[in-house]
Amino acid sequence: MDYIFLITGYKYRHLNLEAYNAKSRAIENEKRYLGNDRNLPFHREREKVESNPNSSDEEDLTSTNNTRSSDNTTSDTEDDSGEDSYQVEWESGKDPLAPKNWPMWKKIYTLLVASFIAIVITANSSIFSDGGGIAAQQYHVGATVGDLCSATFLLGFAAGSVLFAPLSEVYGRLPLYSVTLVIFVVFQIGGGCSKNIWSLVIFRFFHGFFGCTPMSACGGTISDLFNPIQRTGALLVFCAAAFVGPLVGPVMGGYITESKLGWRWDFWINMIWAGLTWVIVCFTMPETHSETLLDFKARYLRKKTNCDKWYNEHEHQRDPAYAIRTALTRGVRLLCTEPIVQAFCMYLVFINILLYICMVGYPLIFYQYGFNAGEVGLAILGILVGILLGLALTPIIYVHYRRRYEMRDGNICPEDRLFPLFFGSFFIPIALFWLGWTCYPSVHWAAPMVSGIFLGWGFLYVLAVCYSYLVDCYHEMAASALSVATFTRYAAGGGMTIVARPMYNNLNYHWATSLLAFVGCGLVPIPFIFFFWGRRIRQRSPHAYKG
């Protein structure tokens, strides 16, 4: 993390270090003058400030940084030497170095970089959907074994999210993005050089495991940068990017596989693409985690003032094992006891299953029209058109939520987030019935392809609304809620990728798609139930926001 510290230290070059030095000297002089008697006025006044750190929000940093005595191991009010330590905080509510106070262009750039990482990684999840079948033929195994290449990627994605989401709260977002991305690049070499189908399956697992960081840390990055109103549009942009990757992947993979390059170039193209992304991340993407930035600030002040007493409390709480254990136990507890988490995880699982079943089902449906692998990828882009149409309505959703937010005098009501899902919940079963009963060879291929527009529209609104609602409902536990949601949706998606081909072969295209549509119909009431009774459900929950 030293290169991050160097960049961050440069940002702090404008600080009035003399003020920090003066503060250190003044407190030391007062302490020598007054002694260590905790009953003296100086200590009583300092304890009063410590107990109400927000009482001096209007002052500059030399008066707002709380002077606290701390034990490096026990967090008592005095350490073994009797010396005080000074906790580093943001200078005020408008500190320009705090991520929420950054210029809007910088926030948008950071969001776009995070979204681009998501496109690169998620494209890898589906780029091999055609190549897996051809590799299976080359290695003389069945097509279902070839589907394992996609399934193990998704299972690795699910497993990695459990590990890397809590680590981003310990070490910051940027180290996780940069380290996992470079490992992801290295494992592409293994995929391209695989000598048998089983080594390919294993490497695909590690592609997913180290590629999960964008989806694992996305909620944290967006929460770091944007207030609740701005988060409405930011999350829609990121969710659109999360779907663009899986939809663009089959187009790329189809044409690469059909060309003279062959299926191995799926991995070489990914390696080049992800490698360039890693360079962009390392040299242009800023750290957004507030506590990590305050750690850097404390480190910078210790170096520049030659005073080792500046600290941030987060520095002494870096316990990755505890963070992972807490995320696991909290996530399991939320999934087992919270109706909100159960319902919206079920919805997220359903759309992820649909997305990756489409990667198997669309080729089966459109091959009967004489499409080749590249043209089947283009057929899937109908879903992308729907996602972009849904994204184009972001200003309307933003205005709606802002009005509701202002009507409540700035108090967040999570149920206000559910408005887009009133439409999205109907779009998905309509699109599936449309696809299922127009995919006859006697019907023009454009008819089933157009159904993808409504499917994509529904995908976007379900993902964005579910994530927003979970964040607003669980606040401090939002990271755990999103972590368990990410795990369940990708684990289920990986399992269903294996059964999709037998399902379509045994039920035929029409009834297999209709079966999914009936499941979608069963999920339609969820947003309406929580819109009318969500507040009552939250008030009965020991973990959810009660407002």
From Swiss-Prot:
Where does this protein chiefly localize? membrane
Q: Superkingdom, according to UniProt?
A: Eukaryota
One GO term describing the cellular component: plasma membrane
Q: Which UniProt keywords apply?
A: Membrane, Transmembrane, Transmembrane helix, Transport
Where composition is biased (Basic and acidic residues), the residues are: 38-50
**Membrane topology type:** Multi-pass membrane protein
Q: Which GO terms describe its molecular function?
A: amino acid transmembrane transporter activity; transmembrane transporter activity
Cell location? Membrane
Q: List this protein's GO terms for biological process.
A: amino acid transmembrane transport; transmembrane transport
Q: Which SUPFAM superfamilies match?
A: MFS general substrate transporter
Low complexity: compositionally biased ranges:
62-75
Q: Indicate the transmembrane segments per the record.
A: 108-128, 148-168, 174-194, 197-217, 233-253, 265-285, 346-366, 377-397, 418-438, 445-465, 478-500, 514-534
Question: Where do the record's region annotations for Disordered lie?
Answer: 38-89
Under InterPro entries, the record lists: MFS (IPR011701), MFS_dom (IPR020846), MFS_trans_sf (IPR036259)
Fetch the Gene3D superfamilies from UniProt.
MFS general substrate transporter like domains (1.20.1250.20)
Q: What protein family does this chain belong to?
A: Belongs to the major facilitator superfamily. CAR1 family.
**Per its record, how is this protein called by name?**
Uncharacterized transporter C794.04c
Taxonomy-wise, where does this protein's organism fall, top ranks first?
Answer: Eukaryota, Fungi, Dikarya, Ascomycota, Taphrinomycotina
